[in-house]
From Swiss-Prot:
Residues of the CoA carboxyltransferase N-terminal domain: 72-329
Taxonomic lineage of the native organism: Eukaryota, Amoebozoa, Evosea, Eumycetozoa, Dictyostelia
Source organism of the structure: Dictyostelium discoideum (Social amoeba)
Location of this chain's protein in the cell: Mitochondrion matrix
Pathway in which the depicted protein is active: Amino-acid degradation; L-leucine degradation; (S)-3-hydroxy-3-methylglutaryl-CoA from 3-isovaleryl-CoA: step 2/3
Record note on quaternary structure: Probably a dodecamer composed of six biotin-containing alpha subunits and six beta subunits.
Annotated keywords: ATP-binding, Ligase, Mitochondrion, Nucleotide-binding, Transit peptide
Gene Ontology terms describing biological process: L-leucine catabolic process
Top EC class, one word: ligase
Name of protein: Methylcrotonoyl-CoA carboxylase beta chain, mitochondrial
C-alpha cells in the first residue's frame, strides 16, 4: 500500500502509495493505486543508514520453501474466494433492489467518499462468519475501516442494508464499538454512513441491555465529542429507534431525500401506539428534519450529493497531525515481501529464523538489534517502516526467562523514548518444567506481561504463526489493547494446541481411572482425544477467531509492510508522549 516517502523542505513527509495498478477497498492481497498520499506533518531527517542490514537470503529452490508457499497460497486462495462472497453483502437480489431505489451499495459509498486512488484499510471482513447458523451476516452487516478524505485519515462505519436490513446482530455491535475504539485511541474523525433498521429484535437480549451492547455506541459518541474527535453522520437509509441518536449526537448530519429517515418510533409503532397513520417520509424524512426539527444540518437529493457534502464537511475540520517522532526518507526492503508466504513453515511446530521476515518488512532491511546474544528466542530491535521509527519484538522460539526479561527491558526503552512497538507473534508459550519453575520463569514472564500492559506507546500486533497460552499475553494479544491486531491466513490462536489439550485431558482421565484400578486401551484414548483436538483446531482457526472480531483483519503476508505502515500512520494522529514521571528504565 505504501511505497515511497518524499522529503520536503517544509519538513512534511508524504507517504506515497505506489503499488503497481488498480485499487481496493479491503486489506487482503489486492493492489492499490499510485495516487494516494498520507500526509504526516512531522520533523524529518535523512534516512538513517547506521543500522545493520539483515541477511534475508533464503533458498527458494528448497523443498521446504516450496511446500510452505504451496500451503500458504492454497489457504490464501480459499480466503480470497470467501471474501469475494462476503463483498456481495446480502446477495444479488437485494443489491439490485437497493440500486433500483437509487441507492449506492455500501462499498460504492465508501469508494466515492475516500480520496481517489487512496487505500481503505478495512477491518474484520470475516466478522460474523458462520456464527448464526443458516443466517449469513456478511462482514457482520457493517463495513468499518480507515480511509482518507481530503488527506484526513478517518474511521468509516457504514451499515449494509442488504444484510438483514442493516440490523444490529451481536457481532455488528461488537464491530461498531471496535471501530469507535480505534477512532478514540488514534484521535481519528469518525464518519457514520447510516442505513440500518436498528437492533435485531429476535436477538435483543444479546444486543440491547449490557454494558458493551447497542447503547454503548452513543456513550462512545458523547465521550468522543468531549475529546474533540469529530463525528459526522450521513443518513442514507433507515435510522430507527435508538439509532436515531447517531445523527442527533454527531457534530454535523446529512440526510438523503426519499431514502433517509430518522425516527425513534417508525410508522407501525406510531399507528399501534397512537392510531396515527403517517408515512416514513412524513414522520422522519429529509424535509422534516432539515426544515422543521433541525435534527439534520444538510439536505442531499441523492447519495452522490450526500457524499460530496460529507467530503466538504471533512475539508472544514481544520485538522492536522501533531508533532511526533523524527520521520526519515523511506527505503524499500532489500528482499521482496512476496517471499514472506514461503518463509513461515506450514507446520507451526517447526522453528525458522524470524529475521528473514523482519528483513522483508523494514526499510532497507536495516535492523539495530538489542541484546543480540542474550535471550535469543526473542528478537528485539529498532527499525523504520516507511520512515517511521518502530521497536520490533519478534518470537524466534519458545520464551525462556532470559527472553522475557530482555523483552521487558526493550519495551521499557521504547516506552521511555516514545517509539511505537510492533509485535510479530509466533509463540507456543513460556517454557515449562521443574528446572524453569525453580528459576522463576513465572515472575520473569510476569515482568514482560507487566511491561506490555503498561506501555503507553502505540502497539501493533501481527500474528504470523501460532499464538498460544501465556505467550499470547506477553506478545501483546488482544487483552493487552494493541492499537491494531492482524493475523496471517495460517495463524492459529488458542490457550494451547489441540494435540496438547487432548493429551492433558486424556492424562487427567487416565489418572482418575487408575485410582479406580481401571485401564484405558490405546483405541479408547484416541477416541477420547480426537473430538477435543478437532474442537481446538476449529476454534483456533482464523475463520473462528476473526468471525468474533478477536483481530482487526486477516491479511495477505505480502501486504504486511503496507498494513503496518498504514496502521502506524493512523497512530500518529494521537501525540506520542513518553512518560513524564514515575520510574525510569529498570535493567532486567
Amino acid at each position: 500500500m505504501l511505497k515511497s516517502i518524499s522529503l520536503l523542505k517544509n519538513n512534511q513527509i508524504l507517504l506515497k502509495n505506489i503499488i503497481n495498478n488498480g485499487r481496493i477497498i479491503n486489506n487482503v492481497g489486492e493492489k492499490l493505486s499510485s495516487k494516494s498520499l498520507l500526509k504526516i506533518n512531522y520533523s524529518s531527517s535523512t534516512t538513517d543508514r547506521t543500522f545493520n542490514i539483515l541477511d534475508g537470503t533464503i533458498d527458494k529452490n528448497s523443498a521446504e520453501y516450496k511446500d510452505n508457499l504451496i500451503n500458504m497460497n492454497s489457504t490464501l486462495k480459499q480466503l480470497k474466494e470467501n471474501i469475494e462472497k462476503i463483498k456481495l453483502g446480502g446477495g444479488e437480489k437485494l443489491n439490485q433492489k437497493n440500486i433500483s431505489r437509487g441507492k449506492l451499495l455500501v462499498r460504492e459509498r465508501i469508494e466515492a467518499l475516500i480520496d481517489v486512488g487512496s487505500p481503505f484499510l478495512e477491518f474484520s471482513q470475516l466478522a460474523g462468519w458462520g456464527m448464526y447458523g443458516k443466517e449469513e451476516v456478511a462482514a457482520g452487516g457493517i463495513i468499518t475501516g480507515i480511509g482518507k478524505i481530503h488527506g484526513v485519515e478517518c474511521v468509516i462505519v457504514a451499515n449494509d442494508s442488504t444484510v438483514k436490513g442493516g440490523t444490529y446482530f451481536p457481532i455488528t455491535v461488537k464491530k461498531h464499538l471496535r471501530a469507535q475504539e480505534i477512532a478514540q485511541e488514534n484521535n481519528l474523525p469518525c464518519i457514520y454512513l447510516v442505513d440500518s433498521g436498528g437492533a435485531n429484535l429476535p436477538r435483543q437480549a444479546d444486543v440491547f441491555p449490557d454494558r458493551d451492547h447497542f447503547g454503548r455506541i452513543f456513550f462512545n459518541q458523547a465521550n468522543m465529542s468531549a475529546k474533540r474527535i469529530p463525528q459526522i453522520a450521513v443518513v442514507m437509509g433507515s435510522c430507527t429507534a435508538g439509532g436515531a441518536y447517531v445523527p442527533a449526537m454527531a457534530d454535523e448530519s446529512v440526510i438523503v431525500k426519499g431514502t433517509g429517515t430518522i425516527f425513534l418510533g417508525g410508522p407501525p409503532l406510531v399507528k399501534a401506539a397512537t392510531g396515527e397513520i403517517v408515512t416514513s417520509e412524513e414522520l422522519g424524512g429529509a424535509d422534516l428534519h432539515c426544515r422543521t426539527s433541525g435534527v439534520t444540518d444538510h439536505y442531499a437529493r441523492d447519495d452522490a450529493e450526500a457524499i460530496a457534502i460529507t467530503r466538504r464537511i471533512v475539508s472544514n475540520l481544520n485538522r492536522k497531525k501533531q508533532p511526533s517522532p523524527v520521520i526519515t526518507e523511506t527505503e524499500e526492503p532489500l528482499y521482496p515481501t512476496s517471499e514472506l508466504a514461503g518463509i513461515v513453515p506450514s507446520d507451526l511446530k517447526k522453528n525458522f529464523d524470524i529475521r528473514k521476515v523482519i528483513a522483508r518488512l523494514v526499510d532497507g532491511s536495516r535492523f539495530d538489534e538489542f541484546k543480540e546474544l542474550y535471550g535469543t528466542t526473542l528478537i528485539c530491535g529498532f527499525a523504520r517502516v516507511h520512515g517511521m521509527p518502530v521497536g520490533i519484538i519478534a518470537n524466534n522460539g519458545i520464551l525462556f526467562s532470559e527472553s522475557a526479561v530482555k523483552g521487558a527491558h526493550f519495551i521499557e526503552l521504547c516506552n521511555q523514548r516514545g517509539i511505537p512497538l510492533v509485535f510479530l507473534q509466533n509463540i507456543t508459550g513460556f517454557m515449562v518444567g521443574k528446572t524453569y519453575e525453580s528459576k522463576g520463569i513465572a515472575k520473569d514472564g510476569a515482568k514482560m506481561v507487566m511491561a506490555v500492559a503498561t506501555a503507553k506507546v502505540p502497539k501493533i500486533t501481527m500474528i504470523i504463526g501460532g499464538s498460544f497460552g501465556a505467550g499470547n499475553y506477553g506478545m501483546c494479544g488482544r487483552s493487552y489493547s494493541p492499537r491494531f491486531l492482524y493475523m496471517w491466513p495460517n495463524a492459529k490462536i488458542s490457550v494451547m494446541g489441540g494435540e496438547q489439550a487432548a493429551s492433558v485431558l486424556a492424562q487427567i482421565q487416565k489418572d482418575n481411572m487408575a485410582k479406580e484400578n481401571k485401564q484405558w486401551s490405546p483405541e479408547e484414548e484416541n477416541t477420547f482425544k480426537k473430538p477435543i483436538s478437532d474442537k481446538f483446531e476449529e476454534e483456533g482457526s482464523i475463520y473462528y477467531s476473526s468471525a468474533r472480531c478477536w483481530d482487526d483483519g486477516v491479511i495477505d503476508p505480502q501486504d504486511s509492510r503496507k498494513v503496518i505502515a498504514l496502521s502506524l500512520s493512523a497512530c500518529m494522529n494521537q501525540p506520542i508522549n513518553p512518560p513524564s514521571d514515575g520510574f525510569g528504565v529498570f535493567r532486567m
